């Protein structure tokens, strides 16, 4: 089966690295702890979406830098590029799940969303193949609910 050029959060995992639970730390990145910090930021910036987005972006960028340092150290120690690329993709999976959770929990919250009120995230490129180079970026398309 040929990998799709895009991936969604609801798509089945591409490989073993993507099957990791969101609770399993990847490259030192602890998703549950980061999500707790984001929830605290949302509470602190309640009613100020721009300030919340900025604070969340700063937090996630700092966590990404730390995780990339861990990835580099693991790559140099293990000398296994594909494994590192898979781990980086799993890291990005965790970050995208956090972004989705933060957006649906704090920015576009709906207690009982209908089909037309659900947000979708679409990614393209190497991310869809489950492999990320160390300095790769991800092109994401957030498809927002028609009611905002």
Describe the role of every protein-language-model region:
Residues 120-148:
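Catalytic metal-binding acidic patch
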Residues 2-117, 135:
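N-terminal regions immediately upstream of nucleotidyltransferase
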């Amino acid at each position: 089966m040929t990998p799709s050029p895009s991936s969604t959060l609801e798509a089945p995992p591409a490989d073993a690295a993507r099957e990791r639970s969101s609770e399993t730390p990847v490259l030192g990145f602890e998703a549950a702890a980061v999500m707790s910090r984001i929830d605290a930021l949302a509470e602190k910036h309640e009613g100020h979406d721009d300030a919340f987005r900025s604070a969340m972006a700063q937090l996630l960028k700092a966590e990404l830098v730390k995780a990339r340092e861990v990835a580099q150290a693991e790559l140099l120690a293990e000398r296994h590029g594909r494994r590192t690329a898979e781990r980086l993709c799993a890291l990005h999976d965790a970050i995208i799940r956090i972004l989705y959770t933060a957006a649906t929990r704090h920015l576009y919250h709906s207690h009982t969303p209908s089909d037309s009120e659900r947000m979708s995230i679409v990614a393209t490129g190497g991310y869809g193949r489950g492999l990320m180079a160390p300095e790769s970026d991800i092109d994401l398309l957030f498809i927002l609910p028609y009611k905002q």
